[in-house]
Amino acid sequence: MADMSVKQLADLVRTTPERLLEQLKEAGVAITHVDQTISDEEKRKLLLHLKTSHSTETDKKRSKIVLKRKKLSVVKSGKKSVNVEIRSKRTYTKPVVEQKRETEPAPTQEVPLTSDTTNLNEKAEVNVATLEKAVEAEVKEEAKKTPSEKKETPKKGPRKETRRSRKPDKEDKWEREELHMTKLVEERRRRHKPAHMPDSDSASAKLEQGFARPTAPVVREVALPESITVADLAQKMSVKAAEVIKAMMKLGAMVTINQRIDQETAAIVVEEMGHKPKLIKEDVLEENLVATLGEQTGEAVPRAPVVTIMGHVDHGKTSLLDYIRRTKVTSTEAGGITQHIGAYHVETELGMITFLDTPGHEAFTAMRARGAKCTDIVVLVVAADDGVMPQTVEAIQHARAAKVPVVVAVNKIDKPEADPERIKTELSTHDVLPEEWGGDTMFQPISAKTGEGIDALLERILLQAEVLELKAVDNGPARGMVVESRLDRGRGPVATVLVTSGELHLGDILLVGREYGRVRAMIGDDGRPCESAGPSMPVEVLGLSGTSVAGEEAIVVPDERKAREIARFRQGKYREVRLAKKQTAHLERIFDRMGEGKQNTLNIVLKADVQGSLEALTEALNKLSTDEVKVNIIASGVGGITESDVNLAIASDAVVIGFNVRADAPTRVLVEREGVDLRYYSIIYDLIDEVKKALSGLLAPEFEEKIVGLAEVRDVFRSSKIGAIAGCMVVEGVVRRHLPIRVLRDNVVIYEGQLESLRRYKEDVAEVRQGTECGIGVKNYNDVKVGDQIEVYEKTQVHRTIA
């Protein structure tokens, strides 16, 4: 055959040149291009290679042939007939090559099963018993044959044989018991023998990849919220709660498994146990809200100053504001004293001013602090006839803490005993120096009764406001502060909001602390409804979900859903903090109460008209508690007294106190029927004094001892009927019968008892005065000696009061 190119040979054998080049390369022929010629020798070499490779593949595929045969027959035994299905299988194996025959002298030949099955078939026709043995033999033969076909691992071999040897017994049992149910047996055998069984070696290999014990301690990054229970902290560190409690005991803190701990304490515990703490801020939602609102953009315009009038009680703060507003607020206040924060927007001839009137009573410290917090200028009212008082000094401290300027108004200069110079001297001791003395505080003598000096005071206020250059953005979402809040029976929660920037409109979504809502109505300080309020404008807002806490910041939120989420988050956070405080206080009191006597407690259900008054009353009443008696306010709230309040008082044996609120008709009927102690007050002085009297009645009685007389023993008489009788001379006071006595020997008390008998000249007498002789019999005491002294005293109960 003539030489031809690789391409021509590929066309001849009907294959691609590339495939032919690959086969030449596998055959060891050094041809790399399709245009190269291929010789006859190289063709034979390629042909030999192809034959060898194809024969190996076909040998592998056809080295084993299995023929299966199935035969059905019926065996009759009397009236019964049994269907017998006999399956046979024959395997043909191709002989191995000559080289293997030389190395392996005796190849293994499988025993054909056809003859066995034929014999079984013949025997099955004879009787049923022989057929049963034949089926058993066939099953055993197949069971022996099955493991020999599988590849066995030396390590797992014995275990496999044990399992296989057990399996035919179960099948034999089925064959013996259910011989007449051949089809059912086959179906069950098929279910027990799935077509594809997972290899035990691979399964064991998977099982070997189990838990690996760490060689070094696992250090975890523990995410810590602002408060967390001990159980949750232990779960985050994957340790038992007892380990965490033990670690905290080493740090000096006694905790329980359900107790909440703060973030800092949890971080210390995590570091102590070898992990890394990661502090999480839970107020991300609020921060995102503030970032969304951002700084209010727009042109800042001048606004009216917010002026807070502060000073001691009865120094004329509200009277001064009355004269400025040309109204009579003082006459409507209970007792003539202010007990709420009043916000008023006043138009004067000189300009607009917003006044905040704060209480002067010592119980309203929080109100005064709130007034100083949201103000621009503080007007300190001092009575010229009274001088500087404790609440005056407190007002100065609030103004300094808020870093606001102070204008001093010396009131009541119309009185003859007024001394303004003394006021300046007293205030100078508190670093409040007038301008004429080189200080920076403006002083203005005024009279709220006659109106003297009030115009000059307003000029000074506006002058101070010009110096401060007060400006605010008058458009955009409003921001403000809740000055006061209350619960109105007809209108629901009402909050007095002082707008600090932006403009508040009807329908805005307002978020105030833990409460939110849509502004349904706005009422100005003059009692008229309004539709909008700008900077420095106080308005009453209706529509909040609950009574807000005075002093909270009010923000207009564009999305009601976002406002609801933030309010609920704050409520949950407040609840957690309150429970943590209560639990901490409870744990701290456990050891304090050990060894102490029972502490008398006065339970009170307190209801007030506004949030600020409720806060002040709660603080004032809690301050009345002492080591012996305690005020326990079991419930408090804003609004009228309801039946639930009375039922709570009945259950806890409490007194119901209403401050400027009343009970409705059904509640009064319940109070009369159950006999609950219900008290109304409108002046804080009266309320505190009444609670003091009630606490004084709970105090344990205190007794004073007063020595009535002293007798000296001159002689001792013995009597078989009465015992020892001391003949005495009364040297001091009066000796009375049935009073307690003390027997003194060498001025040391040796006995305390009762004076049983008192005689003079064998006559019983009630008392013996000084300088008179008498006979004294001491009850249950006979060891009286000459020279002893008998001291007679009496106990008197002292009325105790709460300081």
Curated annotation (Swiss-Prot):
PROSITE patterns: G_TR_2 (PS51722), IF2 (PS01176). Residues 156-167 have a biased composition (Basic residues). It comes from Coxiella burnetii (strain RSA 331 / Henzerling II). InterPro entries: DNA-bd_dom_put_sf, EF-G-like_DII, IF2_II, IF2_N, P-loop_NTPase, Small_GTP-bd, T_Tr_GTP-bd_dom, TF_IF2_bacterial-like. Residues 336-340 are annotated as: G2. It is found in: Cytoplasm. GO terms for cellular component: cytosol. This is Translation initiation factor IF-2. Belongs to the TRAFAC class translation factor GTPase superfamily. Classic translation factor GTPase family. IF-2 subfamily.
